[in-house]
Amino acid sequence: MAKAKFERTKPHVNIGTIGHVDHGKTTLTAAISKVLYDQYPDLNEQRDFASIDSAPEERQRGITINISHVEYQTEKRHYAHVDAPGHADYIKNMITGAAQMDGAILVVAATDGPMAQTREHVLLARQVGVPYLLVALNKSDMVDDEELLDLVEMEVRELLSSQGFDGDEAPVVRVSGLKALEGDPVWVKSVQDLMAAVDESVPDPVRDRDKPFLMPIEDVFTITGRGTVVTGRAERGTLAINSEVEIVGIRPIQKTTVTGIEMFHKQLDEAWAGENCGLLLRGLKRDDVERGQVVVKPGSITPHTDFEANVYILSKDEGGRHNPFYSNYRPQFYFRTTDVTGVITLPEGTEMVMPGDNTEMTVALIQPIAMEEGLGFAIREGGRTVGSGRVTSIIK
């Protein structure tokens, strides 16, 4: 009976609940866990639902985030579900990437319709690259008028479309988290329908091994008689011995061939995403490469200096700055393994940014970094983290 738990054959998908505070995200999360436990008791653990709301603190890049993780399974998939209870926690979580979501359930109370935070969360989901949203119209048991429900649904679909999601096709499921928790069969079925929609509509994530190879360089050294070795943790993709690679960032792009791959002093034929390894590079001297560059599949990523970003600035209590900053502020931007100085330009109409704020900004780095949309970074001042952000678009 218990064997099903250890099946590693199912796709693993990370999802989350997003939406306005008090629209019932946490109650719905609890309802999903309970309904799936009752439906597939051999696949799911029973949980105490108070434990979802008392979210443990997590630290990501020096930022404290209250966030709770729940695991559950349907017949098709294994899910890790993240619920960030507070609005500020949700924003920090999205920007630091503390929980990368493959898809999200936008929770909208049928009694209220989309509110200011609903909009903000959808916008942020688009900016940080959440690939898929569907909608749980929660508290639907409290609305008797079918036409009113249709109206709210239309409004939510328009909101999704306005932010670049598929508002026409996204499933909108009418649910009641509270009634499902209480065991009301009509509403239990609504939560089952919601999870069936998640199974069907959130695409299987492309796992990191299927993407083009990328390894940030952490260290460079020379092995006498063999050449230059760079070490680091492969971020994505796979790399076979004798492959051509490019070294990108900080300096002009260099091409070379990987003539050896080592892990813990053992020779390997291939390096895989997630592994710490050393790569022996043909024809390069120790001074040709440095920490902060990346080893990549040729043509898969390009170096850039100017970009737009969405940034969270730490509050004083979180160990951040004590005072605001203005345009032309010059901190360090920590990408993957290195700091690069950059100059900040604030958007028109924003005169200054206070500690604890979430803001858009344009950044010009003094050296190019291998960059793509969605890449996370920390903002540092004298080695301590004062903010965290994501690249939303590349300028040059």
Swiss-Prot record:
Region annotation G1: where it falls in the sequence: 19-26
Function in brief: GTP hydrolase that promotes the GTP-dependent binding of aminoacyl-tRNA to the A-site of ribosomes during protein biosynthesis.
Binding site for GTP: 19-26, 83-87, 138-141
CDD domains: EF_Tu (cd01884), EFTU_II (cd03697), EFTU_III (cd03707)
MF term (GO), any: GTPase activity
Protein name: Elongation factor Tu
HAMAP family on file: EF_Tu_B
Pfam family, one: GTP_EFTU
Keyword Signal: no
Catalyses which reaction(s): GTP + H2O = GDP + phosphate + H(+)
Region (G5): 176-178
Region ranges (G4): 138-141
Sites where the protein binds Mg(2+): T26
Primary localization class, coarse: cytoplasm
Subcellular location(s) of the protein: Cytoplasm
Stretches for region G2: 62-66
Assembly: Monomer.
